[in-house]
Amino acid sequence: MAQAGGPTRFRPRAVLAACWLAFFWVQSSRAILYSAMPALSAETGLDPTSVGLITGSLYAGFAVAVYVSGFLPISRRLAIAGGSVVTSLTNVAFAWSDSVPTMLAIAAIGGAGVGLYLPRGTAAIVEAFRPEQRARALGWHELAASAGLMAAPLFMGGMLLVAPWRVAVMLWSLVGLGTALVVWRWVPDAVAPAGRGGGARLALDARVLALACMGGACFAVISGFFTMLPTIVATGWGATPAAAASFAGWTRASGLGGALAGGWLADRAGRVPSLVGWYLAILAAVVGLWFLDYGAAFAVLVMVMTVAASGGATAYYALMGDTFRPAERERVFGLIAATASLIGTVVTPVTLGLVLDRISARAPLVALTGAPLLGLAGVVLYRWASPSTNSRTKSDRNIG
């Protein structure tokens, strides 16, 4: 249904399409940088620890902006479109930088630019669709994450065969400028409540931490792990920079199916039961990776893990949308998503980079086991904090 009294261009499908492109840019703008890291390391001698710090800085800026976004007294269009332009420009600046401190600063600013999107875009989709349609809509939205994290590394892998990584990064920045134009045209110009008295009091309880753990577990795989995957396979098993970037791209593509399956399963079986299943699948895949070297079987388990994490992310977003009132969604979404991003996309790559640098290529795979365990802990905490929650959330019991 279109927004009451609003322009027809703000129909749910139009909002979803614009948010899809914005989320594609959110993910691909960062993926284009981390897929360039093996080439950057070969050019400058950058070690895995420095790579982890740069990518951690990228995601730290993202996490801070995700939290701040819901409190800014500016429209969704300005927050999302403006952030897209900022990140496009900082990616170009990153391509021209040479020192690690400069890269750290630029990465943080660029991450902050796209970080403004997540609470605003997710809230727009939640508000545009009825509860029985919401998880499937968010599943389509989550496709953008998989598509962006697939397309950018594949683009980098192909470009490295014919041009320097810096050229690839600058060309990809055009996607962000195009995204800003689409968002400005098709996303509702709503304003988030800001500051004291700017909306309903935030309902902060154990569910916030529980949801942050659930989201952080998924992000640790689909973002944090893939941030370091090109460096892991290049450092640990001697893959070329082009091959490492391409490997990250085509294995990440498996998340496309997981996003759709996650939306369907969350609507049919319920948010919480589907999350438990996805976390158990991630755990099984990660444990299997402990015993494998880079090759076909390794790739299969990476894809299984990616499908499960993408499905879990969709259910997590749907559960978050069901849990909180409309008046508090953008601000609470910002707090939860920022915490989840800090766990999954800052702590994870920094940790993986450190253990890769100091131990071996297999050590990051062992360390990643903490992600699904964290997700399962989040489910337990959520059920404890929501005693009335059974197999489905209150808002989706009428489904199926």
Tell what function each PLM region has:
Residues 65-76, 259-270, 356:
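Helix-to-loop junctions at the C-terminal end of transmembrane segments
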Residues 64-96:
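Conserved MFS/SLC helix-loop-helix module at the cytosolic interface between two early adjacent transmembrane helices
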Residues 174-193, 378-383:
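C-terminal membrane-cytosol helix-exit motif in multi-pass small-molecule transporters
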Residues 327-358:
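A late C-terminal transmembrane helix in Major Facilitator Superfamily
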Residues 86-98, 281-293:
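C-terminal ends and interior cores of transmembrane alpha-helices
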Residues 34, 208-249, 253-256:
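Extracytoplasmic gate region of multi-pass secondary transporters
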Residues 141-184:
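Helix-loop-helix hairpin linking two adjacent transmembrane segments in secondary transporters
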Residues 106-144:
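Cytoplasmic helix-loop-helix junction between adjacent transmembrane helices
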